[in-house]
Regions:
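Alpha-helical transmembrane segments
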Residues: 2-8
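N-terminal export signals and maturation junctions of secreted/periplasmic proteins
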Residues: 10, 29, 34-87, 112-113
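Bacterial N-terminal signal peptides that target proteins for export
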Residues: 13-25
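Catalytic and substrate-binding regions of cell-wall glycan-acting enzymes that process beta-1,4-linked
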Residues: 55-60, 171-236
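Second-shell loop/turn segments in exported
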Residues: 69-76, 86-89, 112-114, 132-143, ...
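Short, functionally critical alpha-helical segments immediately adjacent to catalytic or ligand/cofactor-binding
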Residues: 87, 95-111, 146-150, 173-179, ...
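Secretory-pathway/luminal and periplasmic proteins that interact with or process carbohydrate-rich
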Residues: 108-117, 156-162, 179-193
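Substrate-binding/active-site groove segments that recognize
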Residues: 113-137, 144-155, 205-207, 232
Length: 237
């Protein structure tokens, strides 16, 4: 059945493929879940099918061709130096290492010496208070940064009580990582009296429409958070 779906995906045009995926998303999800797709480089029929689906999903992402190419190039080079550290940190804090690595790529493109004008630094671009809260003494140390970022994401996941699906919860965790848990909580409280019923789409709309002292004429802080969430999810999936 899964092989038939893959063959069909290759035989139809791109716009038709989008419709095809939407109609058969549940079937694809069930098959992939049952087969427990892995991103480890072990070549099996299942891994080939999973790789094909991943490529299709990436093709329909909102990333530009340049961004996709950059991600692939650095995945084959820079990521390899730190891959085991991502795997070990993710296992320690019960995360998927690909998810952790996707956050790091969006933050720093896996550059341990990355800095921003807002004084966040390192592989996971931690703020000074966040770094202190997870025991990171040197934000430019890639190992400390990876483990600190993993711990922080794990803590956020435990704190987030929003979203009506696992995908929604992941989006809320990412939003909190970028915007801060307090700001996300305040936004959720303004949307609905029952936080557990708030969806990511509702928060996304609220963030885009809300105003902040950090906004510029062309780019709002809320839009920045939405872009962060969507890009990480594109890199991750």
């Amino acid at each position: 059945m899964l092989l038939w779906l893959i063959i069909r995906m290759f035989k139809i045009k791109k716009i038709q493929t989008v419709k095809f995926l939407s109609k058969n998303a549940v079937i694809l999800f069930v098959f992939i879940s049952l087969m427990s797709c892995s991103k480890d480089p072990v070549v099996t029929p299942v891994s080939v099918y999973c790789s094909v689906i991943s490529e299709k999903l990436l093709a329909f992402s909102r990333l530009s061709n340049f961004e996709k190419q950059k991600f692939q190039e650095l995945s084959d080079t820079r990521l390899q130096k730190y891959k085991n550290d991502f795997i070990e940190a993710a296992e320690t804090f019960d995360l998927e290492w690909e998810f952790l690595a996707a956050v790091a790529f969006q933050e720093s493109q896996w550059n341990p010496k990355a800095r921003s004008a807002t004084q966040v630094k390192g592989m996971m671009m931690l703020t000074l208070p966040t770094a202190a809260s997870v025991g990171v003494t040197n934000r430019l140390d890639p190992i400390q940064s990876i483990y600190g970022g993993a711990q922080y994401l794990s803590e956020l996941r435990q704190m987030v009580e929003y979203g009506t699906s696992s995908g929604d919860k992941t989006a809320f965790v990412l939003a909190a990582y970028n915007l801060g848990m307090t700001n996300v909580k305040n936004a959720v409280d303004q949307i609905n009296g029952n936080p557990s019923k708030v969806t990511w789409l509702e928060l996304e709309e609220h963030l885009i429409q809300s105003k902040s002292s950090m906004d510029t004429e062309s780019y709002s802080r809320g839009q920045q958070t939405v872009d962060f969430v969507e890009r990480v999810r594109d890199y991750y999936y």
